[in-house]
From Swiss-Prot:
Belongs to the mitochondrial carrier (TC 2.A.29) family. It is found in: Mitochondrion inner membrane. It holds the Pfam family Mito_carr. GO terms for molecular function: NAD transmembrane transporter activity. Solcar repeats lie at residues 28-108, 116-200, 209-296. Keywords: Membrane, Mitochondrion, Mitochondrion inner membrane, Repeat, Transmembrane, Transmembrane helix, Transport. This is Mitochondrial nicotinamide adenine dinucleotide transporter SLC25A52. GO terms for cellular component: mitochondrial inner membrane; mitochondrion. Mitochondrial membrane carrier protein that mediates the import of NAD(+) into mitochondria. Compared to SLC25A51, SLC25A52-mediated transport is not essential for the import of NAD(+) in mitochondria. The transport mechanism, uniport or antiport, its electrogenicity and substrate selectivity, remain to be elucidated. The chain crosses the membrane at residues 34-51, 85-105, 118-138, 179-199, 215-235, 268-289. InterPro entries: Mito_NAD+_Carrier (IPR052465), Mitochondrial_sb/sol_carrier (IPR018108), Mt_carrier_dom_sf (IPR023395). It comes from Homo sapiens (Human). It catalyses: NAD(+)(in) = NAD(+)(out). Its main location: mitochondrion.
Length: 297
């Protein structure tokens, strides 16, 4: 990966974080990047899931943070982690693909395509994001389980999948277009900016300092991308909250939401501040965990 200091064997004493940022792509087929991505995702979901539920309510209904928290309190602690299985399955799988495929595809493209490095890395990031979208059904079911309007229709992941089955396979992939756009955009920016951001952080001379830098760099980048992609996720959430019926286009749903929220940008970004903090924590955890595990695998 572009800035991964863990891709090279280190001497016992670390001298600088900036010396570890040079591009270094490993051989195709190494599973450590997939495994580290999977473990990083598990760690993140377990910690941040309650925050994600509050954010989901705000995206879906355009309500304030306090009202979303009150909704969750009324639902009770028993339902706080309701629906965690789909995001756990989805995130562990997609982040494994995100990191692993990016490494493999970058290696293949560099070997077989004569193009600038930034171009091959960009293409690898987009292709990895496209592959992640295969698991859209898990994100789809997660959306349904988090929506309290569907609490009386199904109580677990299996029932939610079963409820969609009668509508055909296309129903599992409702909201695919915004997911593809979000994945491609965020992957290109994440892998492209991770190295430069770390270069501008204070020089790290110990493993713990590297861990802090990885958390800060990943967190800042994740927060920025979370804010940038927030309107896309608002539309995606609205699309995936529907069961059956017409498959509406992205522009049509966006226009409908825009009108519902009084054509005000601030209303469209309602919940974005919480998303910013969640993304800051989530991607800090993901990036730091990923880089930490690479040192030991």
């Amino acid at each position: 990966m572009i800035d991964s200091e863990a891709h090279e064997k280190r001497p016992p004493i670390l001298t600088s974080s900036k010396q570890d940022i040079s591009p270094h792509i490993t051989n195709v087929g190494e599973m450590k990047h997939y495994l580290c991505g999977c473990c990083a995702a598990f760690n993140n979901v377990a910690i941040t899931y309650p925050i994600q539920k509050v954010l989901f309510r705000q995206q879906l209904y355009g309500i304030k943070t306090r009202d979303a928290v009150l909704q969750l309190r009324r639902d009770g602690f028993r339902n706080l982690y309701r629906g965690i299985l789909p995001p756990l399955m989805q995130k562990t799988t997609t982040l494994a693909l995100m990191f692993g495929l990016y490494e493999d595809l970058s290696c293949l493209l560099r070997k077989h395509v004569r193009a600038p490095e930034f171009a091959t890395h960009g293409v690898a990031a987009v292709l990895a994001g496209t592959a992640e979208a295969i698991f859209t059904p898990l994100e789809r079911v997660q959306t349904l389980l988090q929506n309290h309007k569907h609490h009386d229709k199904f109580t677990n992941t299996y029932q939610a999948f079963k409820a969609l089955k009668c509508h055909g396979i296309g129903e599992y992939y409702r909201g695919l277009v915004p997911i593809l756009f979000r994945n491609g955009l965020s992957n290109v920016l994440f892998f492209g900016l991770r190295g430069p951001i770390k270069e501008h952080l204070p020089t790290a001379t110990t493993h713990s300092a590297h861990l802090v830098n990885d958390f800060i760099g990943g967190g800042l980048l994740g927060a920025m991308l979370g804010f940038l992609c927030f309107p896309i996720n608002v539309v995606k959430t609205r699309l995936q909250s529907q069961i059956g019926g017409e498959f509406q286009s992205f522009p049509k749903v966006f226009q409908k939401i825009w009108l519902e929220r009084d054509r005000k940008l601030i209303n469209l970004f309602r919940g974005a501040h919480l998303n910013y903090h969640r993304s800051l924590i989530s991607w800090g955890i993901i990036n730091a965990t990923y880089e930490f595990l690479l040192k030991f695998i």
